[in-house]
Design a protein with these regions (language model features):
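Contiguous, low-complexity intrinsically disordered segments that are highly enriched
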Residues: 67-77
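Conserved short "hinge" loops at termini or chain/domain junctions
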Residues: 1-51, 61-65, 81-91
Length: 91
């Protein structure tokens, strides 16, 4: 659920206050949108929840720091998720 993703995201970003919750929830929604533009249909699974969390954390860090590139781990996870989905549809 989005609440679970928010909890994990806050832990990842070392945010303990609820002051940023609305902003972080917006990043979670944006991450889902960006992932869907990659051609991925998200499921209600733990692995897809972690994919959304990783993407939301990347969006947060990108806004806070200069020259933040998409982490290779995230790009790898997106590619693997897309290929597994397309393989299941076409296979």
């Amino acid at each position: 659920t989005d609440a679970d993703i928010l909890t994990i995201l806050k832990t990842d970003l070392m945010v303990s206050s609820s002051a940023l919750d609305t902003y972080l929830q917006t990043l979670i929604a944006s991450a889902k949108d960006y992932i869907s533009t990659e051609g991925i249909t998200l499921a209600d699974s733990q692995s897809d929840g972690m994919l959304v969390e990783m993407y939301a954390a990347y969006l947060y860090r990108r806004r806070r720091e200069e020259n933040v590139q998409m982490p290779r781990m995230l790009r790898w996870a997106l590619n693997n998720r897309l290929f597994s989905e397309k393989g299941a549809v076409n296979g």
